[in-house]
Structure formats: C-alpha cells, structure tokens
Regions:
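Intrinsically disordered, low-complexity Ser/Thr/Gly-rich stretches
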Residues: 1-183
Length: 183
C-alpha cells in the first residue's frame, strides 16, 4: 500500500467527491461484505486472495477488491474510521494471463482471481472486517473504458453492468490467512 492506509471516506474538499462525505462503501456501485463486531482479536497474516464469479454487459471491465479494518466510533473519531488494509484489481481481458488479452462474451459467467498484497495485521476486538467489491478504484487504478478497444487508444466509453455470483456453482469468496490465537 503506497503511503500507508487511507480512511475510506470521501472528503468534501476532494474534487472527485463533489461534497459527498459518505463512506465509499455506501456508494451504489460497491458490493459490501462486513462482519459483525469481532468478539476477540483476529490475526490475518499472509496472501489475500479474492475469487469472484462474475459476468458483465461489457466485453472488458475491471473488478476490484478492498480489505478494510472498520474501527468503531471513538472520542477522536465519532463516526469511526474505515482503513484499507489491502486492495487490488483484475482487468477482465487479462483474467487468464497477463500476456494474452481475451475479451469476455457479455452475459457469460467467468471466474476471476484478485491477488492483494500480503499483509500481517491484528483486527482488534470490536472492529469489523469488510470486503468491498467494485468495478473501479480510481484514482488508485486507471479507469477501464469497458469497450474492449485497445488499451489507451479507446475512442469511446461504455457503462458496464456487472453481476457477482455467490451460490454453490459459483462460490465467490475471500481467502483470509487467519493465524490461530495462542493462549
């Protein structure tokens, strides 16, 4: 993570937020999975991998994943703090290989693997663990035009409608390397 963790809330003075200071997880283009407050400290150490089963209306799009440590409200931070632990992205055209581009058939379900940087963190009792799935994490990653045109030479932009699947045939999940607590 370049420059360390960032609070996952927009600032009213940031041009991309347009005065909206809600948490990024409150956006309607972010799929959120969040635990209840943890009953005990939980150590996560190692590689973080997200497996997604997804389809898109576009021939190319991005899928992003972000692991967040959600701090409860406190005197210093009355609304709490949402600190990103790790994040990453997969461009659909490179879902099977970074060397060979392969566009999607719109509406077809594909498996995607998003590998985040390894981490070592103890999520403290009372905190929540959150995973955000989206199709963009700008400005950290460049925007996908969703058209399938050659990268950086696109002449048009398209809105992609993406679907994430989570059922026995399409088990989307995150692999968290939990280290058992010692007594």
């Amino acid at each position: 993570m370049v420059n360390g963790a960032l609070n996952q809330r927009c600032r009213s003075d940031y041009w991309a937020c347009k005065g909206d200071v809600r948490p990024l997880s409150a956006r309607n283009d972010v799929l959120v999975f969040q635990t209840s407050p943890l009953q005990a400290d939980l150590e996560v150490t190692g590689r973080l991998i997200v497996k997604l089963w997804a389809s898109s209306s576009a021939p190319d799009t991005d899928f992003t994943a972000k692991l967040t440590d959600v701090y409860p409200p406190s005197n210093d931070f009355p609304t709490g703090v949402d600190l990103n632990v790790a994040d990453s992205i997969i461009r659909a055209r490179y879902r099977t290989s970074r060397e060979k581009s392969e566009l999607m058939t719109p509406g077809q379900v594909y498996e995607f693997t998003i590998e985040m940087y390894p981490t070592s963190l103890v999520f403290k009792k009372g905190h929540r663990i959150r995973v955000d799935i989206s199709s963009s994490n700008f400005p950290r990653f460049d925007v996908n035009p969703n058209t399938g045109e050659p990268l950086n030479r696109n002449r048009r932009w398209a809105v992609a409608t993406n679907s994430i699947y989570h059922d026995p045939q399409h088990p989307s999940h995150i692999e968290l390397p939990v280290i058992p607590a010692t007594k």
